[in-house]
Amino acid sequence: CLTDLKERFALCDIQPGAPLVPYRETIVRAEEMRPPANKELGRGAVVATTSSKQVTISLRVQPVPADVTEFLLKNADAIKRLYDRKAKVEESEGEEIAAETDVAAGNTLSVEDFKKQLKEKLESGKGRENWKDRIDKIVAFGPRRTGPNFLIDATADGIFSKAFAAENTTGAAPRAGESLHPSHLADKISYAFQLAAAQGPLCNEPLQGVAVFVEEVTLNLAEDDTSARDKLGRL
């Protein structure tokens, strides 16, 4: 390629630079760390309010164990099949057969085996009490829905639809006359997670090995005649 550029197109000397190596952003737990910004909330926790003051979100982030991150990276195809099956997206019969053939040949895990192995990796090991029974609380993987990061529903009411659930149970737009509920914001929060996982806070590089626990979503809406659907549009 460089020869063609020099001799046929540019007709001048070209100084090639060093190759660009992609990298990922992550968070780590170390023995010596700065004290948390808010001692009451603890490390990795934040309470954020929208500019309209109508929505407050409490969330916490923590590192995903290294072996779990590696497992997710190796099984991106299984995560993709999880979403495809959940959404019942079958573009063609041939693709469905090909996917099942890959599973039968051992090229990719079935959704059931993927969930089983992921649960074992999350819960086995020292200091992983916080991951117990979290497998059924996973809302999404990211970025691009197949990455090595988790969005986890840690709310008391379970406002999110779960990744391993058979179908979506929350997040639908409010019906006429229905009051706005935090679950109506679930898909918006999930989308925000995908954006944040795709562009990290330091260098806008994708995140890797980060779990986001959404602990509470609070609405503070003025009582008026505005419909819930209109309020959701403004939020």
Residue ranges and their predicted role:
Residues C1-L235:
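Accessory interaction regions appended to the cores of large information-processing enzymes
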